Amino acid sequence: MKLAACFLTLLPGFAVAASWTSPGFPAFSEQGTGTFVSHAQLPKGTRPLTLNFDQQCWQPADAIKLNQMLSLQPCSNTPPQWRLFRDGEYTLQIDTRSGTPTLMISIQNAAEPVASLVRECPKWDGLPLTVDVSATFPEGAAVRDYYSQQIAIVKNGQIMLQPAATSNGLLLLERAETDTSAPFDWHNATVYFVLTDRFENGDPSNDQSYGRHKDGMAEIGTFHGGDLRGLTNKLDYLQQLGVNALWISAPFEQIHGWVGGGTKGDFPHYAYHGYYTQDWTNLDANMGNEADLRTLVDSAHQRGIRILFDVVMNHTGYATLADMQEYQFGALYLSGDEVKKSLGERWSDWKPAAGQTWHSFNDYINFSDKTGWDKWWGKNWIRTDIGDYDNPGFDDLTMSLAFLPDIKTESTTASGLPVFYKNKMDTHAKAIDGYTPRDYLTHWLSQWVRDYGIDGFRVDTAKHVELPAWQQLKTEASAALREWKKANPDKALDDKPFWMTGEAWGHGVMQSDYYRHGFDAMINFDYQEQAAKAVDCLAQMDTTWQQMAEKLQGFNVLSYLSSHDTRLFREGGDKAAELLLLAPGAVQIFYGDESSRPFGPTGSDPLQGTRSDMNWQDVSGKSAASVAHWQKISQFRARHPAIGAGKQTTLLLKQGYGFVREHGDDKVLVVWAGQQ
């Protein structure tokens, strides 16, 4: 989850005119939005480590380690000591995209760990390719190009094939006797991420649940109608796309109303994305009902597709007029007839008048009224600057991210249920003696696994919750999935355990502490820009792919090109397919990557444009060729675990760029002919 744009103006301006500095390092240079880098030659020894930005001093919050993501906090009296074990060129990289800065320290190795065999981008004249396959396929073997379905017989260690006209010069080579997809492996997963509300409307009757409605403008932050039934309707499409895991936005009940959207408050922002949860025991009515969810999960499993829920344990949603009125918490500055006159019969129908914005509803709310706000979540559940609640802290674990109420997941005090649940008659939450907020959250979330056979979670804002909480979630969800599979042997896809991946801004291909606390993979934030540098020459991915294939023999990452929190990757047209789908490790397609879904309206929040409606009209229209290209490469990936899980050997070819990936008995050879 990215920070809500309506609050960005209140955060430190990490990405503006001021520059980061650190003693002993030259001024940092910006490398992409929100990331800053500086290099320095340093001697072996011990030195203090502090960083400065706009007269604010920052220091690592934890022990200083190389190649680890370190959270930064305001400086205390004693700066931490950094022990340098050898002379070398050190790099400091600061990432501010999550709203709180993080630091990564690395050192230049004496020799490159992996040297690319590609010196310049190969050129191709469009003629058939003669490929030496002697080290991959035996003499006399029948080798198939999966893309074109051509078959060639290995003769004198070589084959000759013509890349298909629509393949961008690719040959996807496998043994011709390969006739089915291999058993599923999370290291080779192709995950399709959808914001359910923006994908497909399968049930228009639920579009205006809880009194939600359109804004009559650009509909930037309103609910658009996508739901669980719509997802089920498109499972055949996803299966044809080679998808074997579907990550859906959190389907739990969200705040019912809206908050002001964008820095200018120029649109109402509803929780269509699933990141402002209000009740983890209910489905949001806009998403559908429990029968819809069961049908989705069962139908997906029948097609070999796993279901992942997006989950949030760091924060709740904002207070909205709709929820204040319905659940009787909070306080207004208005009284008597003033309430109806200013807000109307139904408060959520309020609209800004001349001179007001969608932020202006806050002017009617008395955020200091202790009695009124005690009726909301309660002090045992959250910290926030509202009422008599404990104030948020300044570190990653206790801060109020984008001014969202921070859940006290670290608390060891029994909390009872959220206070306003007393007025929420439809909740399935039951009080459990001794339970803390963390206990309730992990119990509620794992219950969805136990009831429906959910295969995994994608964890939002992982760095803002203490690691033991994630381990607790993984342990409980894993037990729940085992129970479900035992009770539903006819529905279970296999005996694979519960899978969990997480979002920690700036995380790359490194085996961090998250992997020791329940996570099977972390989202790879580095891959988007690495791929952008290779859109004109696939061979330029060689070093990145070699390094990933080598490192990922011991762990896994989830790499992406586009996301709802960064940008849509539209460079190179359908070349994005091979850039993503041939990557080592698990990969994530963001809905519409395959069909070049257009950027949508944004107002004063540029991220909103990444969440546009799925362009179904283009799938069978102007983007049909692109979709077919994605399908072929993704289906090839699904047939071969070696692509995601295998070791890579780069080949020195007379023409083009090529590599072999090998995992167990599975072996493939991929050739890119070169630029035409």
Curated annotation (Swiss-Prot):
Since only maltooligosaccharides up to a chain length of 6 glucose units are actively transported through the cytoplasmic membrane via the membrane-bound complex of three proteins, MalF, MalG, and MalK, longer maltooligosaccharides must first be degraded by the periplasmic alpha-amylase, the MalS protein. It catalyses: Endohydrolysis of (1->4)-alpha-D-glucosidic linkages in polysaccharides containing three or more (1->4)-alpha-linked D-glucose units. It comes from the Bacteria. It is found in: Periplasm. One of its GO terms (molecular function) is calcium ion binding. Monomer. SMART domains: Aamy. The record marks D565 as: Transition state stabilizer. Ca(2+) binds at N314, H464. Induction: Under the regulatory control of the MalT protein. Disulfide bonds join C57-C75, C121-C537. One of its GO terms (cellular component) is periplasmic space. The lineage of its organism: Bacteria, Pseudomonadati, Pseudomonadota, Gammaproteobacteria, Enterobacterales. NCBIfam families: PRK09505.1-2 (NF007052), PRK09505.1-4 (NF007054), PRK09505.2-4 (NF007059), PRK09505.2-5 (NF007060). Its cofactor is Ca(2+). Residues 1-17 form the signal peptide. Keywords: Calcium, Carbohydrate metabolism, Disulfide bond, Glycosidase, Hydrolase, Metal-binding, Periplasm, Signal. This is Periplasmic alpha-amylase.
